[in-house]
Amino acid sequence: MGGGFLEQLFGGPGSQQAAPPSYATAPIPQYEPAPGYEAQPAHPAVSPRFMKQKVSYEGNERPGTLIINTQERLLYLVQENGRAIRYGVGVGKPGFAWAGTRQITQKREWPDWTPPDEMLKRRPDLPRHMAGGIDNPLGARAMYLGSSLYRIHGSNEPWTIGTAVSSGCIRMRNEDVIDLYEKVKVGTKVVVI
């Protein structure tokens, strides 16, 4: 044989057998995280109950309407033929919950956040302004409700979905708020119960 690939592979004349690799058993040194990349606390996963899903709808609202049930912590986008898309949400904590009917008056991608004066009085540690981005508490999208300070927005704290934690805004997982944002328009009716 001519010393080709098969001979090398299967041990023909002139072949050289490779030695099996050796593995070191020395312990791997422990390193500290780089500055600014400290380990973050683990948070529980979002309950499957609060994941986006298609459900039946038997109410009286027209297709395209948003219904937010603050007790269930669920938002419904009413669709045709007795169907709805359901999303889990975080809602206002005790003393900050509200109900009523509004319209979406603005939509913003990666919105800036300026805490209102009332919030700054309660939380003077908050920044006075924060540019949009992954650290911004409004998340990836925001839909503004009427002339109020309330919004339906994303969150950089997805583990809070299904809880009463906000100052009255309706928060969603970022992937869900992006999905909803694409499905609604300015003028959409929002019913909060």
Tell where the protein language model's regions lie, with residue ranges:
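Compositionally biased, proline/threonine/alanine/serine-rich low-complexity intrinsically disordered stretches
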Residues: 1-54
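Gly/Pro-biased beta-strand-loop elements
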Residues: 43-158, 179-186
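Short beta-strand-centered segments at strand-helix junctions
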Residues: 167-181
